[in-house]
UniProtKB/Swiss-Prot annotation:
Its EC number is 1.14.13.-. The modification N-acetylalanine is found at residue 2. This is Dimethylaniline monooxygenase [N-oxide-forming] 2. The gene is FMO2. The keyword Flavoprotein applies. It is found in: Microsome membrane; Endoplasmic reticulum membrane. Lung.
Amino acid sequence: MAKKVAVIGAGVSGLISLKCCVDEGLEPTCFERTEDIGGLWRFKENVEDGRASIYKSVITNTSKEMSCFSDFPMPEDFPNFLHNSKLLEYFRLFAKKFDLLKYIQFQTTVLTVKKHPDFSSSGQWEVVTQSDGKEQSAVFDAVMVCSGHHILPHIPLKSFPGIERFKGQYFHSRQYKHPAGFEGKRILVIGIGNSASDIASELSKNAAQVFISTRNGSWVMSRISEDGYPWDMVFHTRFKSMLRNILPRTVSKWMMEQQLNRWFNHANYSLEPKNKYLMKEPILNDDLPSRILYGAVKVKSRVTQLTETSALFEDGTVEEDIDVIVFATGYTFSFPFLEESLVKIEHNMVSLYKYMFPPQLEKPTLTCMGLIQPLGSIFPTVELQARWATRVFKGLCHLPSEKTMMEDIIKRNEKRIDLFGESQSQIVQTNYVDYLDELALEIGAKPDLISFLLKDPELAVKLCFGPCNSYQYRLVGPGQWEGARRAILTQKQRILKPLKTRSVKAAPNLSASFLMKILALVAVFVAFFSQLYGF
């Protein structure tokens, strides 16, 4: 008899978890509290309690080739960076292709998830749900928590003395939908993440003045990288990831700083991070530098005091006649249907093995999906999480002892703090390619570059120097997809398809490029084995 799996939420994590359950012969049931799929990426005009919320203009920060699921490329005519409505269209195509809707119970709220009385032997869970005012209870062999972590807003009002006297309007960024109604206002945006920079840039086109307040500053990247290709297609390659791991951090950070400052000098724009040697996630925003250059956005330091109409900043400056304050200060993790002891978040550390499994459970039958912030696309990340989790549920993959898992959690957290800092916003941040490979290794889906170099040099070059996207994890191991090789070799066509809307004479192709990459790949392996064996 197939094991029954409860999937909580029908957003991105929920949809891919459903598919992975079906792929492994499990029997999933998904509980979705709203009337439709899409989660965070389904825009609604009104903010709803208990549901993620986005503004109407949201565009993906990761490109389509780096964001698609591993055996379902996005249509080639889709733009490289997608408006939220276009991304939702892709999820609908995905759900239809793999017939996932039949597993979803819509407008059903999960009230509680508790261990079954015989959990220590069965690993089962009792899930209580509510629909149409009626409660139901069912027993499941495993649970995948896919409810997201952009729901409960974090508004640290105590950190802003005088907020109670402020006479203007203030709200969290999750309540922002569009710029209508803010024309001619003087607006203060607190925070400097992606949402803060998006909202500040958008509002500045019609507001009287926008200020953006930051404690530490931030690097800003454009979605457009070398030769006009999407940034993540250039940044996330195995070769560059290996270099970043091998080189001393001062060297790799210096190289990254030079690259980021090539677009504009961050110090001149008052954006340079205080601790620029931490590898915090940069902002992806194509408009912010221009809006600062136009004077429409002004960067300010930390707010120390608010009055009825003004804001005092750490550097002693004051801005008067503030009409609106937008708190783009992130979110707090919340899983109200789970016992607090299951997902522990203490001392800025999430006590989950590889950001997924509670280590203290006698049976590894509950996992949190997507509770991670990779320096890359979340979609391939959560897909590999789901592929691994479902194989653990099925007994095909095994977890180490609780002691070993706790040691890994502590060590991983120490490394995270060393790389990214102790900020609340970096609590689940991780390196992208390293984490994908780590999960792929668990299920036997990590490609062996040496093997491919010997039998398929053309593909090996793409694997090493090309974008590290999800197709790579369908070449070997369980769940192989026969279209993976072709998807890797033809991804450039899908990148250029929506751009080539006018006939232009093609530039000559440098035939030496392929040979140079082959030689470089061989040199990399020679250097690696020389170091390994002391040649």
